[in-house]
Amino acid sequence: MTRPAVIQPGTADTYAHQALALIAQHRLLTSTQLHQMLMPHTPPRKIHKVLAPLRAEGLIAHTALGVRSGLKAHFLTAAGAQVAADWPELRGRAATVIASPTAASMRAAHTLAGVRAHLAFLTEARERGDEYQPLDWMPEVTHRLPDTGGQDRLTADAVLHYTATQPRRLQYRAFVEIDRTTMSSERLARKLITYARFHDYTPQPAGRRGTAADQNAALSAWQRFYPRFPRILFILTGAPRATLTARITDLRRMAADHGLVTRLASHVPLGAAILEDLEEAGPSGPVWTPLAGTGERRGWTHL
């Protein structure tokens, strides 16, 4: 009996699919970043052959990054978002359509700083043989927070899902906050209060007054999404080292002085690192300052 031929998509089609999925999830990616994620062991020019048909079909567009640099950041068009909307790897993640190259350029600095951090984790995972893929960094994850005094939602810049395979198999999750020093240090530190409230928040059963038994039986809000509360990582860039170090000190002070955050720190690893250190030494290098306890720097899994 003759078996029917199995039709496999060509390599070019597979790369095009993956590139569109990556742009859909990460919002904005440079050609270099796409090359690092998708085909790091091939000549850089090959990524342009992947992107050209997507651009010709109107699925992606780009914005120039600086007048002299020649760098471009690619983003999804409405047509591209429609194509990728039902893909399994993007399920539950509505693709963000950026209206124009101007709109893309205005959000590029923050978005691409996050991608740089993601690539630091991805590069190290590949070197170590850990399980962490280009889609394991999920940008702009939002959770509703009814009890936060008007700030009714928590939006993390990203959530990462990482599985270390050596010396034993361990799964890690982290909320990631990217700080480019565009907000005050106090406002940055206040994000810890929002995370602490999310950690403590237990929704009341609808239509019930909430007896002690009900409260004990109810899940905390975060347990609806995570088996363990993710560690919280602040990644700073965009200013002299002295400024970034001072902001990390302010984060540590918030963890020490605010009772709600102090309680969070007793249950959840909290740390901060400078992006350039992260890129140079890798996430497992001694680049993370714990936000509670001793300030001795360490790797992110040892916070």
Where are these regions (language model features)?
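Nuclease-adjacent, charged terminal/linker segments that flank catalytic cores
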Residues: 1-102
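Electrostatic, structured charged patches in enzyme active sites and in nucleic-acid/phosphate-binding
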Residues: 2-17, 100-303
